[in-house]
Amino acid sequence: MKKLRIFSVLLLLAAAAVFGAFRIYEKGIEDHDAPVIACQTDLISVSVSDGEEKLLEGVTANDSREGDLTSRVVVQDISEMQEDGTRQITYAVSDSRGNVGYASRKLQYTDYSRPVFQLQRPLMFPLGSPFNVCEGLTASGSLDGDLTDKIKYTLDQTISTAVEGSYTVEYRVTDSAGNTSYLQTSLEVYDPRDYQIDVELTSYLVYTPLNTPLDVGAYYAGADWTNEVALNIETDLDTSRPGCYYADFNVSDGTYSGKNRLIIVVS
């Protein structure tokens, strides 16, 4: 009986020793090293329409135990645009044990442009009628396409549809690169009895380059009126300075009159 107890104790000690040795061995082979990502260049130039395959061009990944992991590399993040016009793109890759490696490089676009606004109708609204300040206004960008649902605005005062007048409004829209475009202009609440003639324009908002002449009269499409009318264009346009300007198209047949407005952005 005594020999049996001694044998049991020895067996237990042997099992403990084997288990301990196994744990030490297992710990010795645990993988704590993250895969390493390498980028062929520090800067990649792409089109705004290029997908992830193009963004991964020249990127490889290798793990000390599992070897080549290039096929597992993903784009983890793209920062907002920096002052120099580039963004930082961050890549990530994970091995089978969950160790994650990262790498970053600069990204620049070959065809990027900031968001712009479009206007389908004049910012003129009749007295007594409810309206949406963003009515007829859309926005788009080369990077994201339609940005209309991202438009925000600020008014310098509360608008009353019962009081005619001009109200300053600033529209703004931001794309996924973090760039914000602004449109600071005015909208008008008018008495429809003052404007009996419908004045038609081909556009209601145009962009023109700095120091480039613009023929605002070319945007006049006519007046919906049976009698002959005289056209008078009033504008504060100065193409030598960036900013938002207007051109008012006033028509009259001597008795009745009409008006429409073109907004001009010089940039």
Q: What kind of feature is each model-predicted range?
A:
Residues 1-39, 50-51:
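Gram-positive cell-envelope targeting signals
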Residues 15-18, 25, 39, 54-55, ...:
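A short linear-motif detector with a strong N-terminal bias
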